[in-house]
Amino acid sequence: MTLDSSKYPLLNLVNEPAHLRDLAQDKLPAFSHELRDYLLNSVSQSSGHLASGLGTVELTVALHYVYNTPDDRLVWDVGHQAYPHKILTGRRDLMHTIRKKDGLHPFPFREESQYDTFSVGHSSTSISAALGMSIAAQKEGKGRKTVAVIGDGAITAGMAFEAMNHLGDVKSDMLIILNDNEMSISENVGALTNHFARILSGSFYTNIREGSKKLLSGVPPVKQLASKMEEHIKGMMIPGTFFEELGLNYIGPIDGHDVNMLVDTLRNMRNLKGPQLLHIKTQKGKGYKPAEADPIGYHGVPKFDPNTSSLPKSKPGAATFSNVFGDWLCDIAKQDSKLMAITPAMREGSGMVRFSKEHPDQYFDVAIAEQHAVTLAAGFACEGLKPVVAIYSSFLQRAYDQLIHDVALQNLPVLFAIDRAGIVGADGETHQGAYDLSFMRCIPNMVIMAPSDTNECRHMLYTGYQANCPVAVRYPRGSAGTAEIATNMQLLEIGKADVVKQGAKVAILSFGTLLENAQLAADELNATLVNMRFIKPLDTALLDELINSHDVIVTLEDNAISGGAGSAVNEYLATQKAQVSILNLGIPDEFIKHGTQDEMHDEMGLGEQGILTAIKAFIN
């Protein structure tokens, strides 16, 4: 988006944070207004994450105004809220490329800018990373400051608490900013708390506090009494007792949209010693009425007209895998009250909105707590309930020990509905579901399935639900197949593949939705085409037939080649001393950047033409 200097006179002066610091403080409210307007107009023309960034405009301005970035370290959690940060740090004129192939990264990314001190995308990592940076600065004798910005959702995750517990122990000089935008911690915002925050963060109070500690250090009983009195006084006026118990000096809550208040408070806190936590209250979608009214709907948006009060409706199309999963859950719940559906804060994305409303007693959103989600399911299974864990592929990585130790080791019947498997598209490296087959395949007792289309997904979910062992059904973002979704549910034979087309010489073994892309190669080469369905157990009887009747075996998967489904076939063929040539097609040994699913598949040679070309090159 080209900057109209007449519309954005202040923003036009700022190409990096040093320029922002040249502005007089009384200009910051007007500057924040311009930044918010530019963000809205930019994202509405390009698509992307909107509501979170609208809510952090004043915070972003205040942080870059007070802190000497990039020398001072600023760490954003997750990164949805970092669009204003990107605009202020030299990337304003590239915002129209965000989340597009070869464009700006959707999240803070170290390779993109020196201002992005830590690459993010998953939640609750900021405090740990910032603590590491803070300790490093102290060891190097450098005076740089470290700030972690984390939301009220992300701070509930275990990793954030682990980091705060450690921070309180080592007492490193760093600041945590708790961006509370959902009224989930406190509603105590107003003139009194703003005034109290100024007092508690100011030098007068801090000097008295630290001086008293030194004076009373030789009189332990009196020191302990004074400390308790301070905690009780603060506890009557502020909701930060929990953080104080962890060893953090708590300030707030304050209005996160009062940029001058933020600047004053941050200036006070910048020079405080030890761990600090500033609690700010913000509104997701701030400044744009439709986003304020529907922050979830405006979290991630397509291109839209900001002058209208609604987002464009999606064009009718084939049902997505997430929709099919959600409908399947509702169908099963009508038949079985033992069904327990669990999600770690992915209700909308996993297609569970309808289920959560129709079956609230069987629905458990455990927040950003993947480890807990999996072990909760294990506990359900121990008592004869039927747990289904709906989780994104890239987030299941965070619960790997629980998958092994708490589920598979005990051979508990837990069904994992793994969404966003394979290439997900515009969210890039942190969200690609490239590794689940590789890290699950080595776990004993697991059954792993990959549907070729949405109808088959429904049958696989039903099959997994009936099994008496841990089962994973992994499916991609979006849809596959054009047929109407069947109302019936078919029990599939475990470990049995489906031969789609009988050919000669070349056999293409497809695991998942790339089956459709393999049709062209199968037709042109008169190859046998197999929908393998099961990654574990493999259909070894069929494999025996194929290696005795074909010269070339090709495996195809939307997963890392290393350790994936193709590797499983390789391992089996090696035990049989098979005299066939083997070609493995899948995701290469590198982190896949952002772009549409089709763009990235084509780039990796997993589109129709790419598969045909790769097989031709191999057999020739």
Curated annotation (Swiss-Prot):
| Pfam families in alphabetical order | DXP_synthase_N (PF13292), Transket_pyr (PF02779), Transketolase_C (PF02780)
State which residue ranges cross the membrane: none
Catalytic class of the enzyme: transferase
Give the UniProt record's GO annotations in the biological process aspect: 1-deoxy-D-xylulose 5-phosphate biosynthetic process; isopentenyl diphosphate biosynthetic process, methylerythritol 4-phosphate pathway; terpenoid biosynthetic process; thiamine biosynthetic process
Stated EC number for the protein is 2.2.1.7
What GO cellular-component annotations does this UniProt entry give? cytosol
Q: Which sites bind Mg(2+)?
A: D152, N181
Key words, A-Z: Isoprene biosynthesis, Magnesium, Metal-binding, Thiamine biosynthesis, Thiamine pyrophosphate, Transferase
User: What SMART domains does UniProt report for this protein, alphabetically?
Assistant: Transket_pyr
List the catalytic activities from the record.
Answer: D-glyceraldehyde 3-phosphate + pyruvate + H(+) = 1-deoxy-D-xylulose 5-phosphate + CO2
Highest taxon above the source species:
Bacteria
Required co-factor?
Mg(2+); thiamine diphosphate
**Involved pathway(s):** Metabolic intermediate biosynthesis; 1-deoxy-D-xylulose 5-phosphate biosynthesis; 1-deoxy-D-xylulose 5-phosphate from D-glyceraldehyde 3-phosphate and pyruvate: step 1/1
Q: Which GO terms describe its molecular function?
A: 1-deoxy-D-xylulose-5-phosphate synthase activity; magnesium ion binding; thiamine pyrophosphate binding
Cofactor binding note: Binds 1 Mg(2+) ion per subunit. Binds 1 thiamine pyrophosphate per subunit.
Q: Where does thiamine diphosphate bind?
A: H80, G121, H122, S123, G153, A154, N181, Y288, E370
- Per the record's keyword annotation, is Metal-binding included, yes or no? yes
User: Which NCBIfam families does this one have?
Assistant: dxs, PRK05444.2-2
Q: Per its database record, what is this protein's job?
A: Catalyzes the acyloin condensation reaction between C atoms 2 and 3 of pyruvate and glyceraldehyde 3-phosphate to yield 1-deoxy-D-xylulose-5-phosphate (DXP).
Similarity comment: Belongs to the transketolase family. DXPS subfamily.
How does this polypeptide assemble, per the annotation?
Homodimer.
> What protein does this entry describe?
1-deoxy-D-xylulose-5-phosphate synthase
Q: Which gene encodes it?
A: dxs
